[in-house]
Amino acid sequence: MDVIYIQDQEIDHYNGQFYHSKSEHFFSRFLAGLNENDTLTVYTGIINRNCAQEVAKYKDVTNPRITYKQVPEFRNPKNLLAINRLMKRVLKDADFCYLRSGIAASFASTICLKKHIPYMAVVNEDIFRNTIAHSRLLVRLSAYPLSYYTHRMVREANYACYVTQDYLQSNYPCKGKSLGCSDIEFLDINELSLTKRLNKIQKQAGTIVLGTVGSVDTELKGQDTIIKALAKLKAEGFTNYIFQMVGTGNVTHRTQSSCRVGDC
């Protein structure tokens, strides 16, 4: 059985091994239900690292039953045709696909629908919200077409797996079978609780700690926005703020961002 997983997002490669920033089971979980002789081919962005330190905090996802193949850099518009050609070639004999929201998956879904190849949409983000407010103009311009094709990919999927219980399901509905796999529950926030919290912050005389939880090496989590805001506060004389980040990934880029705005 020829099973294929497709995503834009990058994994890391060093010394013959492959690494993921979050989980050692990120791809092996898709082997469930396959026979021992079946294999999974993952088409993904791959970053080649030059030293062990760069992947020291990442998870080894090397697996004899998983083959990793390079997808061209999706952020470069010149590669769009190459990605489309690649999808046409690799899906020629595919039996089933896992498509994670993105450009490559959007191309792949068009081919799957044309060739009647069953697939599962892996819906892990609100792709419109993540692109429409991006710092790069080119990414913002891609928000509408990418949103359209992502909505179609999810809507027409045989199956959809969501990382939320309600939010993504309501924004990216699927006509096929779907599953929400989030284990996070949000408490209701009323106006009184919000007012009390804001008053507490305004009366805070000591150090105020700001925190984010999420991958530290992606631009979509908002850490750079906080770093820039803190730099402006510092320039205005407000220095009683500390920013703490919790998450997987290489923190080097965030440190460089801090230095660029003069806060290192």
Residue ranges, per PLM feature:
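Active-site proximal beta-strand in glycosyltransferases
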Residues: 2-8, 112-131, 176-181
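Conserved donor-binding/catalytic core segment of Leloir-type glycosyltransferases
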Residues: 4, 199-221, 227-230
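Short N-terminal targeting/anchoring amphipathic segment
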Residues: 87-105, 118-120
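N-terminal subdomain of nucleotide-sugar transferases
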Residues: 1-53, 64, 92
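Nucleotide-activated donor-binding/catalytic signature segment of Leloir-type glycosyltransferases, i.e.
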Residues: 242, 255-264
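Acceptor-binding helix/loop patch of EC 2.4 sugar-transfer enzymes
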Residues: 7-17, 68-73, 120-150, 188-189, ...
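A short, active-site helix/loop in glycosyltransferases that binds the activated sugar's phosphate group
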Residues: 143-198
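Conserved nucleotide-sugar phosphate-binding/catalytic loop shared by glycosyltransferases and other
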Residues: 48-77, 262-264
